[in-house]
């Protein structure tokens, strides 16, 4: 039995984003074409004597989607003592989906590591409780999103060519960002 798993969590890039309306729950109705890109966070999950997360980034544990995903698994299965080593390469608060990608890959990894026998639909049901972007990372490639971003259709034609992503390290607090 394998007692550790190494995963790569890809970033995503919105090639298009159309905001159509705002729902009563403060989510927006959108149409978007999203592409997974070759920028990855690296995650190693290993059986341990307790649950712990180590990372090279300053992430508030209350906001950490890996921690929230673990809480959902704990409610269903009880203790699954696991050590998570996360190397962040996707910039925080950049809109590139790093946290959502990490959560999706953590759930996939835990499923395999602990033989939880969750199918893709089970994983997506858990993902829905974590955030609208999480389930996008169960269907890599190019996807069309609609609704709150939770209605996902794969696009079979993948754009050819390259992309260069520029990122300014200036972080906007979530409270300020949400105000706009």
List each language-model region with its residue ranges.
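Gly/Ser/Thr-rich beta-alpha loop segments that engage phosphate groups in nucleotides
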Residues: 66, 95-101, 133, 149-151
